[in-house]
Amino acid sequence: SSLNGKADGNLKTAIFKLVRNFTQVSSYSALPQYFQKTDVYPNSSRWWDMYSDIVLYAPSFKGLNREHSFPKSWWGGSTTVPAYVDLNHLYPSEMAANTAKSNYPLGMVDRSYNANFQNGISTVGYPVSGQGGGAKYVFEPDDEFKGDFARTYFYMASAYQDLTWKYTYMVSQNLWPTLNSWSVDLLLK
């Protein structure tokens, strides 16, 4: 494979070249149909939601949003770039959790302050010192889902390394490393 023997920036660029000709989701409005294949627990009709422990069932999408886990505002909010409808970072999300998460970077929430939002899975609040990349608030996912976010963020940083990042809370325009060290530490916990 074109990825064998590659590491760091060379691996990231090889992934970028490999995935550039991917099949796109037909439209943003069609995402719930795709989510029924990618984000429903096996042997049940329960939505897989990395943002909330509220149980909602497919095929109804009532109470859910289409969440850009890698916030679209980070690349300027364009709806014409392939990242906007890339299923590799779009997830069903309970509405209140999605609204609270906003476009905040992932980070560890400072527990010495009251959280702005906490639902048992997602926490939004002030970042611990050294995290957040200058953002006032951060979104901390549950430990159960940090690996999912790590894969998602690595994919997005690799597949879209040609995008100009408007917000660089977690990512830099550098070829390597792309994710800031504090965000890597969080995602590996």
Language-model features and meaning:
Residues 1-56:
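N-terminal module-boundary/linker segments of secreted carbohydrate-active enzymes
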Residues 57-189:
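Domain-level detector of nuclease and nuclease-like folds
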